[in-house]
Amino acid sequence: MRVIVYVSVGNSDDRLTQAEWHDFHVAMRAEVVTYAAVIHGEWFSDPVAKWQNASWCLEFDSNQDMIVAKKNATRIRTEFRQESVAWATAATEFI
């Protein structure tokens, strides 16, 4: 069963320094995004925007891969003092 998930992270509360934001993004990419079978998209805020954000559209081959990625996202969020990661599981409809 394939699962589509949109994942979004940000630093709108300005808790992370630029170096910490970099490390947060690298950790998310390494320990969440890489579990996806397909990366349908990867988006970032404007480099000169007041706040930093990143989003991914991910397709997982299995529910188990998605669960591991979600647990990793929760752990990373906690390590980097972030209140949340947006995790939206999409019911995909082909029309």
Segments from the language model and where they lie:
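Short, intrinsically disordered low-complexity segments
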Residues: V33-I67
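Alpha-helical interaction segments
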Residues: G10-R15, V33-T34, D46, R77
